[in-house]
Amino acid sequence: MSWLFFSVATAILWGAAELFYKKGALPNEKYSHLKICVCVGAVMGAHAIFTLLTKDIGYNPINLLVYLPVSLLYIVSMAFSYFGMRFLEESISDPIENTSGAICSLLCVILLKETLTPLSVVAILIIVVGVVGVGYLENNGDTQRKKTLGKKLAIIAFCMPFIYALLDAFGSFVDIFYLDDFASTPLIGVTEDTIEDVANTSYELTFALFALGLFIFMKAKKVKFAPIPQHKDKILAAIFETAGQFTYVYALSGNGVIAAPIISSVCVVSLLLSRIFLKEKLSWKTYTFIAVVIIGILLLAVSEEL
């Protein structure tokens, strides 16, 4: 039953990561979202080096370039997410971001001519209803965010999780061509046993280089960096994110049919943690539509594994 432990651990770790991302994304700190990227890149880079030193995956550095399209889609999507977290409640942003799986399914139907099961169609429709409901309440209601940020910035902030979902979905879609079959993958020198490690290491090293570039950019702009202890929330978020990636692989390798919906419950974990630790409180109407989104995501996770 180790897969069950890893499944629950993944949901908790990623839920905790979302909590600390939100705590580290300070609205009054102009470059806080970029500083989070630097922290995540540093931790992922360290994990990539650890993988290369402890595992014989036959890594070819050219795979950094080969896997670059996927890596960039994932990295840029996360940067948009971190920006949105500065102004948007985690209770709203996380369920919307997790609709990326539904978008990826639609891309497969449209571009690869794949078919959806009736349950998948129902799940996607439920997600759409929930997202439209949240969007309607956010843009037509008299929210505190509009009063605090102004209408323009409030709308921009609300768009961030949607941009994340789109970019992450395209990243997952393109990832199919890299990871679906090791015999036809563009990745160089991989086997059935090493293909996922090679892809993940390429992603983590790219994130580390991206983080280094952002660090140099901010130094050139004379952005002030507080002592490391003051960045503890950003660092903890990066650690939980990377740890969740580790447990995720082992969870799906055991019993993917049950593991997938458990992992998808990260939305619920994030919602609970935000309510408990961040004291986020939304209207009952908004919570209702968020619940609809979460139900749709869980149904989609189940339908994809049946």
What are the language-model segments listed below?
Residues C37-G41, E97, S120, I124, ...:
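Residue-level recognition of transmembrane alpha-helices
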Residues M1-L72, M78-F87, Y136-F162, L166, ...:
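Membrane-interface interhelical linkers
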Residues S81, A102-V122, V132, Y250, ...:
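C-terminal transmembrane-helix exit sites in multi-pass transporters
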Residues L13, A17, L73-F80, S100-L107, ...:
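Membrane-embedded alpha-helical core segments of multi-pass
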Residues A169-F177, Y248-S265:
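Alpha-helical transmembrane segments and their membrane-interface junctions
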